[in-house]
Curated annotation (Swiss-Prot):
Coiled-coil spans in chain: 395-529
Sequence segments annotated as region (Repeat 1): 6-71
Record keywords: ATP-binding, Chaperone, Coiled coil, Cytoplasm, Nucleotide-binding, Repeat, Stress response
Annotated region (Repeat 2), positions in chain: 86-150
Region feature NBD1, mapped onto this chain: 163-344
Domain notes: The Clp repeat (R) domain probably functions as a substrate-discriminating domain, recruiting aggregated proteins to the ClpB hexamer and/or stabilizing bound proteins. The NBD2 domain is responsible for oligomerization, whereas the NBD1 domain stabilizes the hexamer probably in an ATP-dependent manner. The movement of the coiled-coil domain is essential for ClpB ability to rescue proteins from an aggregated state, probably by pulling apart large aggregated proteins, which are bound between the coiled-coils motifs of adjacent ClpB subunits in the functional hexamer.
Keyword Nucleotide-binding appears in the UniProt entry: yes
Stretch list, region C-terminal: 773-865
Organism this protein belongs to: Clostridium tetani (strain Massachusetts / E88)
Broad class of where this protein is predominantly found: cytoplasm
Positions with a binding annotation for ATP 1: 210-217
Name of the protein in question: Chaperone protein ClpB
A Pfam family annotated for this UniProt entry: ClpB_D2-small
Length: 865
């Protein structure tokens, strides 16, 4: 027996048969061990053929194990050391298999030859099992012919090439017949263009090119459904579309040439079908370089000749980037395909597409989807999710909203869950009190038992209601699933022209199920008041999902949030003292945005704050962020003093290709991509280079910016605040108490025009001037600083009391009109905080005491009260 003449699977079978003999303590290697190894082979050819002969493989394997246990065993120390010896009948199997292989005109002995040789052998154990399971040679040969086709065994791994399309592909026509594909709405023009290209004599290979998520694969599924319905030209009727799985084709190809062998087997099957099979390769760019190792060919070069001759009908699908990167590079491959551009559908088209899918989602999740939710999904996804494409992002929203409602149905309602937890806690308390003997414990036990019985009654009532509601929803889901299955049967009956079945389904079963669904829906609507479970996806759920994804508040305003927004101006004024004009402008911009009245193509607001240092420009941005997001973390702060050189623009949007830092992205673009709803603070903008302002033009006008990788970043949900000290010397001259003098305003405006270009200033929503602080405002600021100190001391249970005289001295000593409120803060830190800290460390001030702050002469003194 020449081992080189055996296929890899046969060599594996011999090894497996030896392992079986050792496992069962058999000293002789019999044909039965070989038979067992063939049947036990996972994903092997023999189990596949036997399965097609309608033989229960599990039962067959159990029978073989029983037979192996009954064979003579050799036990003891001697048996351990001695090997396993092949019998004469075992060797005869291979002699017979060699002659069978010659009859088949095969170059190698394969597993099917071994199986046929075993069938012809004299082993009584094998014959007994074959007879018991009715495994006959003629039947085996018929199924083998179906699996092998006209292929010959001329390689060492032929089993991997049998039924190659079934193994490495998916029959879309079969899926369409079984009602497994989602309905495809619209896209008629694209499908017609594909049909025209497929009907050509040569170069009949369309490649669908479009952005990810626009529905390229869905269009091919739509074509498969049309072929099933017969809604195609005569030339495409009865064609089969096979979707090739490149991953499965490459996976497990260990040796050089194995991948090419598999692909050749697939192509041979397509060629032998004489144009009946159309091959669909999703992500077709993967064929360029797929399976390529040193010295071997890639998949692209293997299919080129067949594409050129028109022997292979192939449809590809890829994105613009991948087409340019892989297919366009290979000009010979590119010219063999005809591009079909798939554009992103409009919002209206997306609504139609989702309406077509609505029923499938309702059946899967067992819920109902409102039409308003479908419209909201299309419109809101287009507006707020800018880095993905329709209809994919809108379908994802509907799917996730359905999943959210479904999980809420499956889990206990909050009210019922809290009652069950309370009962559990009371049961524990009851057990503890039962062990106590004092009168108070006995009284508490009596009260507890009454409360517990009331809660248990309530729990019983609510659980019954919950179970009833859940049962109604599950029944509705089952009815909808049944209706979907019956519709699939109707389509099949119409294709097969079974008129009796069509009449029975169309006029008997389907109307009956529909009337049951209507009855259930009426019942659910009637009892909807006070329902514990929600089984509808509405606009609100879609808004919630978008808010989770992006962080942008899209949900309808609830009462608490309305009050918070209406109070926003007062909240800002309480922290930013004396700058009412700036506070009003910013809070009004936020109100417009949340009410949906802002221009959807521009940022929420873009402002430039002008004024001397320390008057509250940066503080306003921080306070706004704290009020909107409950933290200052969502502020994106860019210090423009770091962008004084011309080349530093690249730090904002990312370095160009070939430069260090290209992969990292820009500081501004990456920050906004991660947090699309945020406050962006460009501090000290006059310090930046002139060229930096050129990138602001797109942000301020269209609310977008393209980064170094060509991706668009959306600024439409950002508040842009820029601060500058330009004209601060003029503002310090302002003598007007309740505002800014007109002459001062004109001087500041002229200074601004001298520094910035008109196209930049013209795009800003508002230029706000901050006036110097008055004495009254300084006192209020001191109160804010002291409140911060009080809050810190409160943690230690220490009370701080400051006299008015002390506050006046702080204002006099700490405030400087040129430097603003910052020196005042430093003064309070140095004089007040430092003195308190020293006394805490000494132990003079301790937890629970009161501190008084007063003056003595021109000095602030601190002491215990």
């Amino acid at each position: 027996m020449d081992i080189e003449k055996l296929t890899l699977k046969v060599q594996q079978t011999i090894n497996d048969s030896q392992k079986i003999a050792v496992k069962y303590n058999h000293q002789q290697l019999e044909p039965f061990h070989l038979f067992a190894a063939l049947v036990f082979q996972e994903d092997g050819l023999i189990p596949n053929i036997l399965g097609k002969m309608n033989i229960n493989i599990k039962v067959l394997r159990d029978e073989i194990k029983r037979e192996l246990n009954e064979m003579p065993k050799v036990l003891g120390d001697g048996a351990q050391n001695s090997g396993v010896y092949a019998t004469r009948s075992f060797e005869e199997i291979f002699i017979r298999a060699e002659s069978i292989a010659k009859d088949f005109k095969d170059s190698y002995i394969s597993v099917e030859h071994i199986m046929l040789s075993l069938m012809q052998g004299r082993s009584t154990s094998i014959k007994k099992i074959l007879d018991k399971f009715n495994i006959r040679k003629d039947k085996f040969l018929n199924v083998l012919q179906q699996v092998r086709g006209n292929q010959r065994v001329d390689t060492q791994d032929p089993e991997g090439t049998y039924e190659a399309l079934v193994k490495y592909g998916r029959n879309l026509i079969e899926d369409a017949k079984k009602h497994k594909l989602d309905p495809v709405i619209g896209r008629d023009e694209e499908i017609r263009r594909i049909v025209r290209i497929l009907s050509r004599r040569t170069k009949n290979n369309p490649v669908l090119i479009g952005d990810p998520g626009v529905g390229k694969t869905a269009i091919i599924e739509g074509l498969a459904e049309r072929i099933v319905r017969g809604d195609v030209p005569e030339g495409l009727k009865n064609k089969i579309i096979f979707s090739l799985d490149m991953g499965a084709l490459i996976a497990g190809a260990k040796f050089r040439g194995e991948f090419e062998e598999r692909l050749k087997a697939v192509l041979k099957e397509v060629e032998n079908s004489q144009g009946k099979i159309i091959l669909f390769i999703d992500e077709i760019h993967n064929i360029v370089g797929a399976g390529k190792t040193e010295g071997s060919m890639d998949a692209g070069n293997l299919i080129k000749p067949m594409l050129a001759r028109g022997e292979l009908n192939c449809i590809g699908a890829t994105t613009f980037d991948e087409y340019r990167k892989y297919i366009e590079k290979d000009k010979a491959l590119e010219r063999r395909f005809q591009p079909v551009i798939i554009d992103e559908p409009t919002v209206e088209d997306t609504i139609s597409i989702i309406r077509g899918l609505k029923e499938r989602f309702e059946i899967h999740h067992g819920i109902r989807i409102h039409d308003s939710a479908i419209v909201a999904a299309a419109k809101l996804s287009q507006r707020y999710i800018t880095d993905r494409y329709l209809p994919d992002k809108a379908i994802d929203l509907i799917d996730e909203a359905g999943a959210m409602i479904r999980t809420e149905i499956d889990s206990l309602p909050t009210e019922l869950d809290s009652i069950k937890r309370k009962i559990f806690q009371m049961e524990i308390e009851k057990e503890a009190l039962a062990k106590e003997k004092d009168s108070r414990s006995k009284e508490r036990l009596e009260d507890l038992e009454k409360e517990l019985s009331n809660l248990k009654e309530k729990d019983k009532e609510m659980t019954a209601k919950y179970e009833k509601e859940k049962e109604q929803i599950i029944n509705m889901r089952n009815l909808k699933q049944k209706l979907d299955e019956v519709k699939g049967q109707l389509e099949k009956a119409e294709r097969e022209y079974d008129l009796n079945k069509v009449a029975e389904l169309k006029y008997g079963i389907i109307p009956g199920i529909k009337s049951q669904i209507e009855e259930k829906e009426i019942l659910i609507k009637e009892n909807s008041q006070g329902n514990m479970l929600k089984e509808e996806v509405t606009e609100n759920e879609i808004s919630k999902i978008i808010s989770h994804w992006t962080g942008i508040p899209v949900t309808k305003l609830i009462e608490g949030e309305k009050d918070k927004l209406l109070r926003l101006e007062d909240e800002l004024k309480s922290r930013v003292i004396g700058q009412d004009e700036a506070v009003e402008a910013v809070s009004n911009a936020v109100l417009r945005a949340r009410a949906g009245m802002k221009d959807p193509q521009k940022p929420i607001g873009s402002f430039i704050f002008l004024g001397p240092t320390g008057v509250g420009k940066t503080e306003l941005a921080k306070t706004l962020c704290k009020n909107l997001f409950d933290s200052e973390e969502n502020i994106i702060r860019i210090d423009m003093s770091e962008y004084m050189e011309k080349y530093s623009v690249s730090r904002l949007i990312g370095a160009p290709p070939g430069y260090v830092g290209y992969e990292e992205g820009g500081q501004l673009t990456e920050a906004v991509r991660r947090k699309p709803y945020s406050v962006i603070l460009f501090d000290e903008i006059e310090k930046a280079h002139d060229d930096v302002f050129n990138i602001f033009l797109q942000i301020l006008d269209d609310g977008r910016l393209t980064d170094n990788k060509g991706k668009t970043v959306d600024f439409k949900n950002c508040i842009i605040i820029m601060t500058s000290n330009i004209g601060s010397s003029y503002l310090l001259e302002n003598k007007k108490e309740d505002g800014i003098d007109e002459t001062v305003k004109n001087k500041v405006s002229n200074a601004l025009k001298d520094r910035f270009k008109p196209e930049f200033l013209n795009r800003l929503d508002d230029i706000i001037m901050f006036k110097p602080l008055t004495n009254r405002e300084i006192t209020k600021i001191i109160d804010i600083f002291l409140q911060d100190i009080e809050n810190r001391l409160k943690d230690r249970n220490i009370t701080l009391i400051v006299t008015e005289n002390a506050k006046e001295l702080m204002a006099k000593e700490g405030y400087d009109a040129i430097y603003g409120a910052r020196p005042l803060k430093r003064y309070i830190e140095n004089i007040l905080e430092t003195k308190i800290a020293k006394q805490i460390i000494k132990g003079d001030i301790y937890e629970g005491c009161k501190i008084g702050v007063d003056i003595k002469g021109e000095e602030i003194i601190i002491g215990k009260i």
